[in-house]
Structure formats: structure tokens, C-alpha cells
Amino acid sequence: MNYYSTSIAKLIEELSKLPGVGPKTAQRLAFFIINMPLEEVKSLSQAIIDAKEKIKYCRICYNITDTEVCNICSDKERDHSLICVVSHPMDVVAMEKIREYKGVYHVLHGVISPIEGVGPEDIKIKELLDRVKNGNVKEVILATNPDIEGEATAMYIAKLLKPLGIKVTRIAHGVPVGGDLEYTDVVTLSRALEGRREL
């Protein structure tokens, strides 16, 4: 039996599609939204539409941006000879929160996962190799998640980079196996970056 009007039921259904939002949270959010002033609801909807329509990928690092080149890649103060490779744009946010890393990034947009049908050609590995070959890169830090797929991806990339004579390191210490960088606290992530090891 459906206790809601069609429009509320539809809103709850759509909110339930968001990651980490179950039926009860979706219901709570839906009722919060319908009690918001109309102008705030319109502003929220417009912000979602704008983000979806205007966000693109940086042509250098593939992080999300609303310009051709992201703020990090266009920052002359950053060390462009140091590239930190991460799986997802949210990992860049996690790394930036520690305020210690002064290099640039490369976002893979996934990890190698044969079970999910994701191979090296499905993520931005070729683009990383092209960038390293064409740039003045001294070190690549592999900061994929410390789970099976993240480790496999890091080892695969390290194997491809070794012949190029570039220092390849892996973050270590404190990032739990099976954990996500996105949820790792700032101190742990900072120590992991400091304790990176060469591969």
C-alpha cells in the first residue's frame, strides 16, 4: 500500500537512487524538500542541473572541472614533475584536504577489475603514459585504494612506468586494506603520503 501522493513517491524513488541513501533517508529528504521555500528548491534543482551540464574533465589530469584545464593543473606554484595517480575525482579532494601535497594529479576514473569487466583500456592509463612520456615528470605516486583492484591497478601502472626511468612510489602506512581514500581521515592520509614506498 502506497501512503504517499504520486509526486512524493516519485521524489522518494529518485532520492533512493543516490549512493548511501536508503528508503528512510530518502523519505526524510523528500519531506524536508517539500517543506523548503520554493525558491530554495528551485536553487537546489538548478545547482544539480548546472553541475551536470557544466562539469567536464580537465584535458590534462581528467579531474572534474568547469574549465578546459582545472585549477590544480593551471597552478604555476604546483610541482608538475610530481604526479599523484588516483582512482576517482573524490580522491583528489581527500588528498587536497591534507594540505601537504604540492604536486599535480592524474585521475584514472576507475580501477582494473576483471570481475566488473574493466580492463586497462577502460580507464585513463594510456593518457597517464602519454603525459609521463611527453612531460618533465620525475615521480609518480600511485594512490589507488589499498584493495585488490587498487593494488592490481597500481602494480600494472608501475610495470608500465618502470622502463621509462621514472621514480614510482606507492602510498603506505595507515590506509587500511579494503578502505577508500575518500573516507580516510586527514592524519592517516598524511602519514600514508609521507610513508610512500618505491615500487
Swiss-Prot record:
Highest taxon of source: Bacteria
InterPro entries reported in the protein's UniProt record: DNA_Rcmb_RecR (IPR000093), Hlx-hairpin-Hlx_DNA-bd_motif (IPR003583), Rcmb_RecR (IPR023627), Rcmb_RecR_Znf (IPR015967), TOPRIM_dom (IPR006171), TOPRIM_RecR (IPR034137)
SMART domains xref list: HhH1, TOPRIM
Pfam families: RecR_C, RecR_HhH, RecR_ZnF, Toprim_4
Toprim domain sequence ranges: 81-176
Gene3D superfamilies in UniProt: 3.30.60.80, 3.40.1360.10, 6.10.250.240, RecR Domain 1
BP GO terms, sorted: DNA recombination; DNA repair
Zinc finger (C4-type) stretch: 58-73
Example of a GO MF term: zinc ion binding
Positions of transmembrane segments: none
Keywords: DNA damage, DNA recombination, DNA repair, Metal-binding, Zinc, Zinc-finger
PROSITE patterns found in the cross-reference section: RECR, TOPRIM
Keyword Zinc-finger attributed: yes
Keyword Zinc: yes
PANTHER family: RECOMBINATION PROTEIN RECR (PTHR30446:SF0)
Function: May play a role in DNA repair. It seems to be involved in an RecBC-independent recombinational process of DNA repair. It may act with RecF and RecO.
NCBIfam families in UniProt: recR
Family classification: Belongs to the RecR family.
Name this polypeptide is given: Recombination protein RecR
Source organism of the structure: Thermoanaerobacter sp. (strain X514)
